[in-house]
Regions:
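Phosphate-binding/catalytic loops
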Residues: 89, 95-171
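Helix N-cap/beta->alpha junction signal
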Residues: 20, 94-95
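Conserved active-site segments centered on acidic
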Residues: 2-86, 153-163, 171
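Hydrophobic structural packing positions in well-ordered secondary structure
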Residues: 13, 64, 91-92, 144
Length: 171
């Protein structure tokens, strides 16, 4: 088992306008609130490119802003082949995202995980709130906030390395 330094994290959902931009923004906020001074590269992308160049969904922007997190400057993009060697940790929001990512980059399988499973040990998807109302976005925000706090603690517990075997994801 070899330990890899975790210096870059990519969050991935389907369109990169709801869940993954929230995860990117919330983890940044959690690390800042915790006085985390390590330099991280945190980004987000989608497995699909339908929304490339667009801002996050207005409901994601609103729920983040309600909690003091500004994600309005983010722009959607599709996962690129060069993302796989660039990021130490790639976290999919649901099992379909994880399957798609592993199919795109089989060599990166050990760095691709289901977000909630990796962060909290809870093998659960972050549901896509796109076709739902504001309460669904609020619920997704809470899930992402809790997972981001757990992930920050996990990163802090092992400040320079994280064993890939620590994740229980078997997807």
């Amino acid at each position: 088992m070899s330990a890899k330094p975790i210096k870059s994290i990519l969050f991935v959902c389907l369109g990169n306008i709801c869940r993954s931009p929230l995860a990117e923004g919330v983890l940044r906020a959690v690390l800042t609130e915790g006085g985390e001074d390590r330099d991280f590269v945190i980004d987000s992308a989608g497995t699909g490119g339908w929304h490339a160049g667009e801002q996050p969904d207005r409901r994601s922007i609103a729920v983040a802003a309600k909690h003091g997190v500004d994600i309005s400057g983010q722009r959607a993009r599709k996962v690129l082949p060069e993302d796989f060697p660039r990021f130490d940790l790639i976290l999919g929001m649901d099992e379909a995202n994880v399957r798609d990512l592993k199919a795109l980059a089989p060599a990166a399988r050990d760095r691709i995980h289901l977000y909630l499973d990796f962060a909290t040990g809870n093998v659960t998807d972050v549901p896509d709130p796109y076709y739902d109302g504001t309460e669904a976005f609020a619920s997704v925000y809470r899930m992402i906030r809790d997972a981001s706090e757990a992930l920050a603690k996990r990163l802090d517990a092992s400040p320079s390395t994280l064993d890939s075997d620590q994740a229980s994801s078997t997807i």
